[in-house]
Amino acid sequence: MTKRRVVVGMSGGVDSSVTAWLLKEQGYDVIGLFMKNWEDDDDGEYCSTRQDWIDVVSVADLIGIDVEAVNFAAEYKDRVFAEFLREYSAGRTPNPDVLCNAEIKFKAFLDHAMSLGAETIATGHYARVRERDGRFELLKAFDHTKDQSYFLHRLNQAQLSKTMFPLGEIPKTKVREIAAQIGLPNAKKKDSTGICFIGERPFRDFLNRYLPTQPGPMKTPDGKTVGEHIGLAFYTFGQRKGIGLGGSKDGSGEPWFVAAKDIASNTLYVVQGHDHPWLRSRELVAGNVSWVAGEPPSDGARCGAKTRYRQADAPCAFSSAAPGEAAGGERFSLVFDEPQWAVTPGQSAVLYDGDVCLGGGIIEAAATGRPDAAPASCESALAEAR
């Protein structure tokens, strides 16, 4: 009987290596595919592509599978990195890993795998796929501490129908145990924590290679200038480290946080105290929407939402009829039961019904506890969405 062929995305890490081994043990015809998605010739200090490829080959030899490398650097720069820079230039904070999954790992990679005769693909992500009544659902991993469905919420029915996540039902600690037991050469390799395919280099230095510094005033909510920023693109909502302000600037002793950006005046607004009302939001509007099932929840539906990775699901009410829809495509709004901290434009708002990931969108704006005297641009995005 002909074995089902599965192409496994192998990064050189423990998770994808164990994924390949598990599928081989289950009787699949496994091919490993290593993706090079960044031209790192000038970045040897931070990119680990060469060592990662060596690890992939070593693992493939050990478990007895064929492996090949494919270069998606052009696709990555066109579909992911260009958008990444556009968002930062506009003062937002994008999540390139979300777009990388949708456009590279589960599009360019999937297409290439099909050309190799694969019936399905597999990756080392911690998530699950379930077929129910002819539809495919994306579910959280059993190990919620490692769940990665947040990064996968833009996958559609066609992509999920050809995807397996073998680690979705296995705790991370067990994956490490398996790697050690079968003697994987990378069993003790650290997990990657850098931006998708760009590595773990100092982020501000990296961004400065592509975006110019544009210094401007750093002000408090009452308009007092307390410092100078190097460029709005280099700061994100809720940021504490790297602002360059000491807690004693006005005598309160509390730490400073980035609270707003006024693009028109190139002003960065900062506040003191983690619980400052400018850092709390009860409502958000999101666009660039994607639904796993191809359709949104019903208006008024109760769901849980994450506005950042590893955040607990926050209870909220959903509405798909966000005013301003005609001007900018499909949008939705969420009203939370409790104020959420540092809801950041550019990040993803991902919706859940229990363990089922429904999909989500890119946060355009959030209504905070800012008073009426707040800078106009702080509310303009939300007003426009309305």
UniProtKB/Swiss-Prot annotation:
This enzyme's EC code(s): 2.8.1.13
GO cellular component, as recorded: cytoplasm
Cysteines engaged in disulfide bonds, as pairs: C100-C196
Chain positions covered by the region annotation Interaction with target base in tRNA: 95-97
Amino acids binding ATP: G9, M10, S11, G12, G13, V14, D15, S16, M35, G124
Single Gene Ontology BP annotation: tRNA wobble position uridine thiolation
Chief localisation class: cytoplasm
Active-site residue list: C100 (nucleophile), C196 (cysteine persulfide intermediate)
Pfam (any one): tRNA_Me_trans_M
Locations listed in the record: Cytoplasm
Region (Interaction with tRNA) location: 146-148, 308-309
Gene3D superfamilies xref list: Adenine nucleotide alpha hydrolases-like domains, HUPs, Translation factors
Keywords linked to the UniProt accession: ATP-binding, Cytoplasm, Disulfide bond, Nucleotide-binding, RNA-binding, Transferase, tRNA processing, tRNA-binding
Chaperone among keywords: no
PANTHER family for this protein: MITOCHONDRIAL TRNA-SPECIFIC 2-THIOURIDYLASE 1 (PTHR11933:SF5), TRNA 5-METHYLAMINOMETHYL-2-THIOURIDYLATE -METHYLTRANSFERASE (PTHR11933)
Family membership: Belongs to the MnmA/TRMU family.
Name used for this protein in its record: tRNA-specific 2-thiouridylase MnmA
Organism: Burkholderia thailandensis (strain ATCC 700388 / DSM 13276 / CCUG 48851 / CIP 106301 / E264)
